[in-house]
A protein has these predicted regions:
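Long, positively charged amphipathic alpha-helical accessory segments at protein N-termini or as interdomain linkers
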Residues: 6-7, 76, 82-100, 110-262
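N-terminal lobe of the biotin/lipoate ligase/transferase fold
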Residues: 1-94, 114-116, 123, 261-262
Length: 262
């Protein structure tokens, strides 16, 4: 299903694996070329942002990781996560005729519930990136979530009533991401994508709560409120607090809506 000029140069498939990101890092360390895609039907040790567990059942999800060799500075690698979210929205619209939204920086949502998570990791020096891996876990055809998750997570199938062809969806995402990524490497910043991202931003012009550190561990002095105004060319969330706009970087904070997750 991949395009002829696809950014994806090679696909490695697994029935079961500990984590596609772990495998991606192993391959990158061994010199694997950029554009190699690792796909698994099931993960036994999938992880989300800040080390959180990601449940990866067989037969219902899409779990994949791209091996990347970015030419941008290490500080700009986090922008890859935002582009993956854009690619996820594009693939969902193309394959399922539904346009999701993005909860900055790395969650793609339908009707306020999460359908995927994205985790980008890198090996770098101060001014140089050796490699990065961009992993994405997608709730595609999952039919049921347990009580602790059902208020903030859903699947494409539960949201749309349409079963996802996982191979076609994987190809649609891989091709969409490749186009965004090539442009990012060419430009060096996210200027070309700010408008598109802001249109899909679920929290735009809404009040958000900013947790400096982990949400679970936040003390009152580590919590602030503001209005989300969009992103800048570096991928920071622009938050208006007491009339002045401050850029907030994704590695430092977690964002929640005033009414809950979004």
């Amino acid at each position: 299903y991949l395009e002829e000029e696809s950014f994806c140069q090679k696909v490695e498939c697994h029935d079961s694996i500990d984590s596609t990101n772990i495998r991606g890092k192993q391959l990158a360390e061994l010199g694997e070329a950029e554009g190699t895609l690792i796909v698994a039907d099931r993960q036994t040790a999938g992880r989300g942002r800040r080390g959180r567990n990601w449940i990866s059942e067989s037969g219902v999800g899409i779990y994949m990781t791209y091996v990347l060799r970015p030419t941008v500075q290490p500080a700009h690698v986090s922008g890859i996560t935002l582009l993956a979210a854009l690619a996820m929205c594009e693939a969902t619209y193309q394959e399922c005729d539904v346009l999701p939204q993005i909860k900055w920086p790395n969650d793609v949502i339908i009707d306020g519930k999460k359908i995927c998570g994205i985790l980008t990791e890198m090996s770098s020096e101060v001014q140089y990136v050796h490699y990065a891996v961009m992993g994405i876990g997608i709730n595609a055809n999952k039919e049921k979530f347990d009580e602790t998750l059902k208020d903030k997570a859903t699947s494409i199938y539960l949201s749309t009533g349409k079963k996802v062809n996982r191979a076609k969806f994987t190809a649609a995402f891989a091709d969409a991401f490749g186009g965004y990524y090539r442009r990012y490497m060419q430009d060096g910043d996210l200027s070309a994508f700010v408008e598109e991202y802001d249109e899909l931003l679920a929290n735009k012009d809404k009040e958000v709560i900013i947790y400096h550190g982990m949400v679970e561990d936040a003390t009152p002095d580590k919590i602030s409120r503001g209005i989300a105004r969009g992103i800048d060319k570096d991928g920071a969330l622009l938050v208006e607090i007491d009339g002045s706009v401050t850029p907030v970087m994704s590695g430092e904070v977690s964002i929640r809506g005033v009414q809950g997750y979004v």
